[in-house]
UniProtKB/Swiss-Prot annotation:
Its main location: membrane. The gene is secY. This is Protein translocase subunit SecY. It is found in: Cell membrane. It comes from the Bacteria. PANTHER family: SECY/SEC61-ALPHA FAMILY MEMBER. It comes from Streptomyces scabiei. One of its GO terms (biological process) is protein transport by the Sec complex.
Amino acid sequence: MLTAFARAFKTPDLRKKLLFTLGIIVIYRIGTHIPIPGVDYSAVQFCIDQTKSNSGLFGLVNMFSGGALLQITIFALGIMPYITASIILQLLTVVIPRLEALKKEGQSGTAKITQYTRYLTVALAVLQGTGLVATARSGALFSQCPQANNIVPDDSIFTTLTMVVTMTAGTAVVMWLGELITDRGIGNGMSILMFISIAATFPSALWSIKEQGDLAGGWIEFGIVIAVGLVMVALVVFVEQAQRRIPVQYAKRMIGRRSYGGTSTYIPLKVNQAGIIPVIFASSLLYIPALVVQFSGSTAGWAAWIQKNLADTAAPAHITVYFFLIIFFAFFYVAISFNPEEVADNMKKYGGFIPGIRAGRPTAEYLSYVLNRITWPGSLYLGLIALVPTMALAPLGANQNFPFGGTSILIIVGVGLETVKQIESQLQQRNYEGFLR
């Protein structure tokens, strides 16, 4: 792989794209350390050192921002507003006929949906930025830190507006950087930035496990985490590559004196057709009750029950609800992202058919049947991959947002495989040996 990478770097066009991508990554990482006005960073650093917490929705967003959220920098919101906007637009495409029509218009329709995604990203950045400022000012961002109320010493409207505008502008810059990578670099820009953000949290998270360990100065716990992480990566790579291939045959057509069609291909249905989306949905939805309790400050019985059973990631109720939410969202997202009837209609239009299955409605029913059968093991795999590392590493101080937890492993492996495949295809075009041998 290293030899192939070296050969890719020797190709002028690929080298230019790789260097451009690396340059954008450096700019992005610099932005995650630039402070915004109105924040007492001595208090922020004190609270970060005191709490060492990375759980819940704040932990999820902090992981996606490369640790910039809890440091309240200009890239504090990271790519989370863009991810949320993309998911919302994808869901609305099923509900709103106008968006569904745009999706079918090809490149022009996709450009329009991308424009809507940008607008929604900025709107969500304003909303999330305001929420972050309010959370930091109230002390809820570091609820266990005695100096949490001193993070934003000036509560004037001007300071609040300045902080929100700065973080919103930072989100717009992150979105622009991601699009630059997509257009002029290697891989999907937002996915690359997500990969880098998660990878940036690895050193500190691993070292904190070592510092909290008691066996052999923490090195045994450190080794256990590395071993579990490598096993999980191998498992995820294996399952993410697994797919059910539905054979498709195209009938021959005579146009003039030439024969067209008659080729054989297949429809690849991945075991994990839903990807990482169900885990993100479940994590976000499950944290909403805890967020309501945190902001309300209530000490009633219902609030205590939520804190005990839903806010605690090690509680049996939290684990059970989290697992079933992942399964539900896996089926839900597959249902809206893959339309068997549309696939069957397109096949029929171009003379394609599945051997032994009639074209049209029987083909759609067969695709739905196969998709449901492979979604079951795929959803169970997602639930287990999200929970097993958490439960196995919980005694060592890890949670579902730990770098070797299910969420981060799924993202890192998925983005890594797609990026390597893209470089592989470009190498093959230049008659080089690829990465995946």
